[in-house]
């Protein structure tokens, strides 16, 4: 199978870190293969970095399994370039997972090596593998091991189970196996839906060359089959653990929930149809969702758009005649969902959202019995006064009200968010214009505004940059931008927004205009007063700025103004002075359960004490147990991680550290695996584990400084009770 005789090589580097400017490769792996899964050759070598051994922390050795001492006698990159030149040429296709990272090190340390193109298995996986825990290669491979088609490839490529991830040659093998699996998926989809071959033939996608597909004339108009939308049954709690008569409670009043278990409280409140449950963060929302699902309530609403595709827009899109690489990826994703019976597209790239924005149907509001929201999500609903106005609001975590509301009021504004939205609209209206449905003049006006906004971002960035020229600070407080001579050019452009408003209102829909203009008005409001400016880094040399109002300090009365003409009760699980929402239960199971949880929580601030506690952990009693070490300070987490490695605890436990051993998705996936684990992370990561139903055998509070430490501890007991094994 295949078109021209391309040479396929999988490439992987192990490096001293993730910093593209300062880190170096310490191992290279190359494997040449063909599209039939045959291994044609390969190369692997350790590489000696310039960094001294003392600079290479033990964490590098832990993650890569390489001995730092081994690197001392390894060759430098320039010493092996002649050995690897044979793999590269004008017909070479380089395959890899997140290949741009490896490509950077290839071009920097092995300059001049030629290639035809690169193919990223990370991006291809986002197109063809749906809803994984993470798109980390290790997680994807674990997920695919149960599939017969992948098992066959694994045997062909001689992937040894005893080899490990973070070995360059082994990871190159895995990239090749993942690529071949994904190519086979595309082949299967083309066989099942021949129209995909027609689309590829009309495209710019390099997949067209791999599959040797030639452009063919369509015999008739194409009408894509609809996705199979699965709607959960409409269920509602008829009776809960406690009878709550809302007529007996005062609107806008705060109530304590005492020692009632979270699940019992949810079951009691869920009896009231048309309710919004609002929580201080998404992890708590996910915990509530899981408990409600356990209670049989699955038709839950969320504060986000219901995904629907317009049948007519989809048909026009399918018949437009030529497709970009991004559009082909979207069509592949669509047919992959169709084949698997998935009704909601797993949108996970900017290009996905651009195309979806152009194809989505006008939203029809669904009548959900219960809607789950974060505090911030609820605040955005309340600003749209007509939305869900008949719903009863239960505002959980009212003790976090002060922080969540003030953060919402002073929420930062990222101009790139607005620019991305304008680019989505440009794609939509460019598509509509190509159908002849609107005058090209309207598209031209939209592009003109987008270009003006792009210039505005550049001028504002240049004038902001001056304040950060002679300081290492990444956050500054500035006087109002409006009328500020230091922002002369910015102010000249700010005046022009008013001229664009009526024009923009005419060329896009009312909903789209509201979305854009609300962002513009939020920006202008920020610029009217003293503001915080934060410098965010793309990498070591590129940066951008986000802007926010100075932190607001709102009173309870100001907070309640947002809820005017709404029905709302505010619930606290910490304030014992408040009247109780529910009378104390006759038994005290919850107290016993809480005490059980508290018996497994240790407050230890010294590394030696933590190591001693871990050594005393009974692995026989908890063979799949997890010790969670709560640490909110990144450097202290790193130091503790190194101490665990030096103590050899990585031999007895799986070590997971937030933002060191992987992103949250990868670490959450590993936390569910068999065997004993030590997990180091912050409060938010702990709540994510609770939301994923990961049992915590022991909780060590290592460092938890700050004004909210009592609230955090209370949250752990409240939301983690079910998970403290």
Question: Would you name each region that the model predicts?
Answer:
Residues 2-3, 176-241:
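Acidic two-metal-ion nuclease catalytic site recognized across multiple nuclease folds
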Residues 2-116, 130, 134, 138-150:
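Conserved non-catalytic scaffold segment of RNase H-like nuclease domains
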Residues 93-100, 104-109, 139-208:
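Acidic, Mg2+-coordinating catalytic module of metal-dependent nucleases/exonucleases
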Residues 242, 353-364, 379-385, 487-597:
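A contiguous, basic/glycine-rich beta-loop/short-helix subdomain that forms a polymer-engagement track
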Residues 279-371, 431, 437-447, 459-465, ...:
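A substrate-engagement module of RecA-like helicase motors
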Residues 290, 355-369, 374-492, 575-584, ...:
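Signature of the SF2 helicase/ATPase Hel1-core->accessory helical subdomain module
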Residues 600-632:
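Conserved interdomain hinge at the start of the Helicase C-terminal
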Residues 660-725:
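Conserved RecA-like P-loop NTPase helicase motor core
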